[in-house]
Amino acid sequence: MDKHHNHECNGHECNHVQVDSVTQSLDELNFERGIWGSIINSDFKKVEQLLYKNSSLSNTMDSSGYYPLHYAVRNDKNNDIVQLLLDNGANINCQTSGGATPLHRSCFCNSINNTKLLLKKGITKVDLIDSDGMTPLHKAYQQGNMEIVNLLLQFGADPNILDKNKMKPIQLLK
């Protein structure tokens, strides 16, 4: 029997299908039962239990190259989970294989509270670029979120960095 769950990022609803464990791959089972699935489901208590048993899970990459913090920062309702991960040693500047940081993800998903939290926690690398040459400021302008743009600028983001298409962040404003 298929089970559907929904989550939202950047105004786009994702409809993932959960299928009986008989047909799930090991990667899917690991994700669903691990810290990443608990974060996607905003299950603070489960994340807390998992981290209590093994705090190194806060820096464990999934099979797609994402860390728990990448999932948590996508949605402001996970602000307490973001804080919990950071309190348990999550690397605030961790990068996916495509170079995206948690700050890239929070900016792209318009997660204002998580962006504020990341910046206030002392991100020192506000201008890390991803595989497209984009900084978090590029992502914020791309989404048209001026509140996040202004936050990034207040924390020293460089508005003159060019992405791979030779575009400054402001040129991506919708």
UniProtKB/Swiss-Prot annotation:
The keyword Repeat applies. InterPro entries: Ankyrin_rpt, Ankyrin_rpt-contain_sf. ANK repeats lie at residues 64-94, 98-128, 132-161. Gene3D superfamilies: Ankyrin repeat-containing domain. SUPFAM superfamilies: Ankyrin repeat. It comes from the Eukaryota. Keywords: ANK repeat, Repeat. The keyword Repeat applies. SMART domains: ANK (SM00248). Pfam families: Ank_2. Belongs to the ANKRD39 family. This is Ankyrin repeat domain-containing protein 39 homolog.
